[in-house]
């Protein structure tokens, strides 16, 4: 049984993660989101966890007989990373790829960003060795090994051709509306990917 936990499950990455996990044979995918997105998250085959009222670590542990999940995907950052790490079972991985905890309200705040940075855990390599857990930072824009990138693209293309993944499109915005599209995503109104039309 391979169980994965994805935060912001209704967004562009979360919807893709759910489909990719299923394509790789995950028996259970756990996704956190707000209550209004519950039905949508469940329609993607994920076990829904309410991000406001439930503790995802407790849910992950309870669904796995106390063992934890195989993979945790964390776009939140800050002290949320340690909670995702605690949701892992021994020998498994946490993937960090965002820092949505750095943004609160309508505008960026240096104070909020500094608080997030200060609350980011310092993972102890010795403790990680004892628990056989791994933490990965992921930034596809900075991946410079073409062979790795090519392998990922080929795998995703194969899934698309087989119908195992079908990107969920929330909305398409004209390039002139980029600020509005960003606000739509920032306010967590999207369900799937937000696309920009450059034509």
Question: Where does each model-flagged region fall?
Answer:
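Mid-domain Rossmann-like dinucleotide-binding core that forms the NAD(H)/NADP(H) cofactor-binding site
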Residues: 4-54, 59
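N-terminal Rossmann-like NAD(P) cofactor-binding module of classical short-chain dehydrogenase/reductase
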Residues: 70-73, 95
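Local beta-strand N-terminus motif with an aromatic residue
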Residues: 45, 68-69, 165, 178
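Glycine-rich phosphate-binding loop and adjacent beta-alpha segment
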Residues: 26, 79-164
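A glycine-rich helix->loop->beta "capping" turn
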Residues: 63-71
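Structural motif corresponding to alpha-helix initiation and N-cap regions
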Residues: 53-58, 66, 78-82, 175
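C-terminal hydrophobic helical "lid"/dimerization subdomain
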Residues: 144-199
């Amino acid at each position: 049984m391979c169980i994965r936990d994805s935060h912001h499950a209704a967004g562009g990455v979360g919807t893709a993660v759910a489909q990719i996990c299923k394509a790789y044979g995950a028996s259970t995918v756990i996704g956190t989101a707000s209550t209004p997105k519950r039905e949508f998250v469940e329609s993607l085959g994920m076990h829904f966890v309410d991000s406001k009222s439930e503790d995802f670590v407790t849910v992950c542990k309870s669904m796995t007989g106390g063992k934890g999940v195989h993979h945790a995907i964390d776009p939140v950052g800050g002290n949320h990373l340690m909670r995702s790490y605690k949701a892992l079972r021994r020998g498994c991985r946490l993937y960090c790829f965002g820092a949505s905890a750095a943004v609160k309200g309508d505008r960026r705040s240096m104070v909020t960003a500094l608080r997030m940075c200060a609350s980011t855990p310092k993972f102890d390599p010795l403790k990680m060795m004892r628990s056989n857990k791994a933490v990965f930072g992921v930034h596809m824009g900075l991946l410079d090994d073409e062979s790795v990138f090519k392998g990922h693209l080929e795998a995703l293309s194969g899934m698309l051709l087989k119908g195992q993944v079908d990107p969920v499109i929330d909305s398409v915005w004209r390039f002139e509306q980029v600020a509005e599209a960003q606000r739509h995503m920032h306010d967590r109104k999207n369900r799937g990917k937000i696309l920009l039309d450059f034509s």
